[in-house]
Amino acid sequence: MANTTIIGIAGGSGSGKTTVTNEIMKNLEGHSVALLAQDYYYKDQSHLTFEERLETNYDHPFAFDNDLLIENLKDLRNGHAVEVPTYDYTNHTRSNETIAFEPKDVIIVEGIFALENKTLRDMMDVKIYVDTDADLRILRRLVRDTKERGRSMESVINQYLNVVKPMHNQFIEPTKKYADIIIPEGGSNKVAIDIMTTKIQTLVSKQ
């Protein structure tokens, strides 16, 4: 499907990327849409010991297999189905299971580093950065990681201060300059989301 529209959605952890993504998908009813979460593409670490895997910095660009993501995107854009990897967060490596993806009218690539890789950026028709206050982002991360991932509040805060925050400032925040659209206040900014989805609907209808 050479006329596939590719949308990139980036922003820090807890910024509201998922909310924005869901709003876009909801407003694109009538078009087929696929979501490729960048988290699917954490690198395989089966060659490392479990202890070594625990030391992986998942908030660094090197943690992601962008080559495979780019290859999958090219195949989908050319009308070919792909098998997308999944990640086992318990064993900290790639799972043996994959997810079958068919070509779609619209493909959304969502992740903290969605705009970091130039080759990936150049494939995108629309680049979005979800910009949310750091205090709100850490609060959302606290709720998510303690409730959904069973982590202690202390471990989440320590990880944020020692890894997440410095990686955000070094690698994620600078990608804001590549965005066509910046959405302040994340998913709660209904006006910005409405304007953005209207633009995307117009673009998709022309493809």
Swiss-Prot record:
Catalysed reaction equations from the record: uridine + ATP = UMP + ADP + H(+); cytidine + ATP = CMP + ADP + H(+)
GO cellular-component term (any): cytoplasm
Location of this chain's protein in the cell: Cytoplasm
Documented EC number(s): 2.7.1.48
KW Kinase (keyword) present: yes
Binding site residues for ATP: 11-18
A GO molecular-function annotation: cytidine kinase activity
Annotated keywords: ATP-binding, Cytoplasm, Kinase, Nucleotide-binding, Transferase
InterPro entries: P-loop_NTPase, PRK/URK, Uridine_kinase, Uridine_kinase-like
Pathway in which this enzyme or protein is active: Pyrimidine metabolism; CTP biosynthesis via salvage pathway; CTP from cytidine: step 1/3; Pyrimidine metabolism; UMP biosynthesis via salvage pathway; UMP from uridine: step 1/1
Transmembrane segments: none
Family: Belongs to the uridine kinase family.
HAMAP family xrefs: Uridine_kinase
PANTHER family, A to Z: URIDINE KINASE
Protein name: Uridine kinase
Organism name: Staphylococcus haemolyticus (strain JCSC1435)
